[in-house]
Amino acid sequence: MEEPEEPADSGQSLVPVYIYSPEYVSMCDSLAKIPKRASMVHSLIEAYALHKQMRIVKPKVASMEEMATFHTDAYLQHLQKVSQEGDDDHPDSIEYGLGYDCPATEGIFDYAAAIGGATITAAQCLIDGMCKVAINWSGGWHHAKKDEASGFCYLNDAVLGILRLRRKFERILYVDLDLHHGDGVEDAFSFTSKVMTVSLHKFSPGFFPGTGDVSDVGLGKGRYYSVNVPIQDGIQDEKYYQICESVLKEVYQAFNPKAVVLQLGADTIAGDPMCSFNMTPVGIGKCLKYILQWQLATLILGGGGYNLANTARCWTYLTGVILGKTLSSEIPDHEFFTAYGPDYVLEITPSCRPDRNEPHRIQQILNYIKGNLKHVV
């Protein structure tokens, strides 16, 4: 998408919004599972001078009322309580999903409110017509349920962002390209036809969260408004893009969305400790370009991504895609430069693992989805 060559006043609204403040990044850096990841991502975007081509907007912190548009008061109050005390052994915590993969560490409520607020801020920028694309790379925590934490996610900022967008946009399409099924977002909207959720993810026995088979299609009025594309290990860019484009083409025609929320978790990328898909940022970038050409209000979120350098590579490359910029292969010198060794390049090379996706099974899945979308009115 080239930048508009229009007078500054009308063109300015087409410059993407980038949610950022030093305080926000340092808050996001504190999550134990991804230490300093937010700083690495922002520093690389800055090293390529991409921040200068976007409108930087400082995020607001979500209020209790804003968080309660989705989460229950009881859950939020408990999260606030254990966060103040740093109490990881509270007897009620298990019931709220706190513990093992979502430890109740000190300050976790402030972290959740910061992320939720940042995604709401991005959504509000789209509502206000400030931009067509708003980016919050530290958002995308798609597993949290209304009354429990799950899978490193304490607050479902994606749901909060969608609910905010619903104030203006009648039909919202949520697309989730993280390695894991976007179960929290799907569950939140499984009974409504106003939000369609589409998730491409790894689906195999014992793999978290264990949901998202092609037969999971939503419930009640929301039946056929949940689309799940189960994928096996080893998939690479070309096949992934073919699947993504094929599904999104049908979805767009059937649902006619007015706005898009796009979760771009980088745990699909080769080199991730999840060791499942075999993608590169180029493949995800093609999917992103396909969505951007609809020219709808689009909220961009991050998500998983546990190889920190590769996640920064991926989201910096995707920021370049949003801006229509080709980035130099050589990583510019910056604070985290040494993390990009031994080659110090932006590109990521797929590994030589086999692709476990059989063409006939993929075709079956695509046919099944196409059949379901005939019911969408």
Swiss-Prot record:
Changing residue 39 to A: Enhances the deacetylase activity. It is found in: Nucleus; Chromosome; Cytoplasm. Residues 14-324 are annotated as: Histone deacetylase. Its EC number is 3.5.1.98, 3.5.1.-. Keywords: Chromatin regulator, Chromosome, Cytoplasm, Disease variant, Hydrolase, Intellectual disability, Metal-binding, Nucleus, Obesity, Phosphoprotein, Repressor, Transcription, Transcription regulation. InterPro entries: HDAC_PDAC, His_deacetylse, His_deacetylse_1, His_deacetylse_dom, His_deacetylse_dom_sf, Ureohydrolase_dom_sf. The gene is HDAC8. The modification Phosphoserine is found at residue 39. The lineage of its organism: Eukaryota, Metazoa, Chordata, Craniata, Vertebrata. This is Histone deacetylase 8.
